[in-house]
């Protein structure tokens, strides 16, 4: 998204926030909401990336603690012509990943242990290239600020249930209607904005990510595995913080309750089809990738150590536990 669209999006979310303030507290409530919204936008610009990483207990890694993963991201960043982002691991079984940061110079990428353990090196490269594409397209600032404001709007909607509106703003039916609007319409509108942001940027990041890693089929295979994993492996932190769902490469919500009624992401099959079409146009055949993707994934992370003694470097047959061990 360019800066104009980003500014329009933030302005729209701010108007939603102010509208809830008006419904709950009249003119005074609207002004208080405006002040809070401006403060949140400024705070979000500088700190929303740190908040999201802390929310998911992300652990920063480097070339010593996660050499293969770190070097993979470094190589992909060089391919994209980007500064080296900070690299994080999230100790979460569900395979997934996201990027955050206000600009390419202050960016971070994060992958779950589930993703690193279950995907092949090529698939991990496709996923991280997709996240770097978000950084290059400057989607990350929008993603993090939207997550912050959407969460706040939903929170105010919940407050409306307890506060029940303001007498000055309307008695009787109008007070009830205002409260219902704050409770239902505003959080729903915030979700629609998240959907609009996510659906357009995901296709663009898929395309650019495929260019960065050099093979669209790496990413298409990864998307299929991640989508299947997200359906059966719940991400409890994401379930508790659904406003951040649009940041992930695949919707992390399991569909419990109404969380998944409207997806924040495009249909995975459509994304895979677009990548496969891109591969065909590049003259890349799918047979090699299919063979790789069909291989057992028990030791399939980019640092996976074979169980045999190939190369004579086996450490007594001990199982490698990953770059975070």
Curated annotation (Swiss-Prot):
It comes from the Bacteria. Residues 288-325 are annotated as: Disordered. GO terms for biological process: proteolysis. It is a multi-pass membrane protein. Zn(2+) binds at residues 130, 134, 202. Its EC number is 3.4.24.-. Pfam families: Peptidase_M48. It is an enzyme of class 3 (hydrolase). Residues 306-325 have a biased composition (Low complexity). GO terms for cellular component: plasma membrane. The active site is at residue 131. GO terms for molecular function: metalloendopeptidase activity; zinc ion binding. Binds 1 zinc ion per subunit. It is found in: Cell inner membrane. The chain crosses the membrane at residues 20-40, 145-165, 173-193. Its cofactor is Zn(2+). Keywords: Cell inner membrane, Cell membrane, Hydrolase, Membrane, Metal-binding, Metalloprotease, Protease, Transmembrane, Transmembrane helix, Zinc. Belongs to the peptidase M48B family. NCBIfam families: PRK01345.1, PRK03001.1. This is Protease HtpX homolog. It comes from Brucella canis (strain ATCC 23365 / NCTC 10854 / RM-666). The lineage of its organism: Bacteria, Pseudomonadati, Pseudomonadota, Alphaproteobacteria, Hyphomicrobiales. The gene is htpX.
């Amino acid at each position: 998204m360019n800066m104009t669209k980003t500014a329009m999006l933030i302005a729209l979310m701010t108007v939603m926030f102010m509208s809830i303030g008006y419904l709950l507290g009249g003119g005074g409530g609207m002004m208080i909401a405006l002040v809070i919204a401006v403060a949140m936008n400024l705070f979000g610009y500088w700190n929303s990336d740190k908040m999201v990483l802390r929310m998911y207990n992300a652990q920063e890694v480097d070339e010593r603690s996660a050499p293969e993963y770190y070097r993979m991201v470094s190589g992909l960043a060089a391919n994209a012509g980007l500064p080296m982002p900070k690299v994080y691991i999230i100790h979460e079984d569900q395979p997934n990943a996201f990027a955050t940061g206000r600009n390419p110079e202050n960016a971070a990428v994060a992958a779950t242990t589930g993703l690193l353990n279950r995907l092949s090196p090529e698939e991990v490269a496709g996923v991280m290239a997709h996240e770097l594409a978000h950084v290059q397209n400057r989607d990350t600032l929008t993603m993090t600020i939207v997550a912050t404001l959407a969460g706040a709007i939903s929170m105010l909607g919940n407050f409306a249930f307890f506060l029940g509106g303001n007498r000055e703003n309307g008695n009787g039916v109008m007070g009830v209607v205002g409260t219902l609007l704050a409770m239902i319409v505003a959080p729903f509108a915030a979700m629609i904005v998240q959907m609009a942001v996510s659906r357009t940027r995901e296709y663009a990041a898929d395309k650019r990510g495929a260019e960065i890693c050099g093979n669209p089929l790496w990413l298409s295979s990864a998307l299929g595995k991640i989508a299947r994993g997200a359906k059966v492996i719940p991400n409890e932190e994401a379930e508790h913080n659904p406003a951040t769902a649009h940041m992930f490469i695949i919707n992390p919500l399991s569909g419990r309750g109404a969380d998944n009624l409207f997806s924040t992401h495009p249909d995975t099959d459509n994304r895979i089809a677009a990548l496969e079409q891109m591969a065909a146009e590049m003259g890349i055949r799918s047979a090699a990738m299919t063979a790789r993707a069909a291989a057992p994934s028990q030791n399939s992370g980019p640092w996976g150590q074979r169980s045999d003694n190939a190369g004579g470097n086996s450490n007594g047959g001990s199982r490698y536990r990953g770059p975070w061990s």
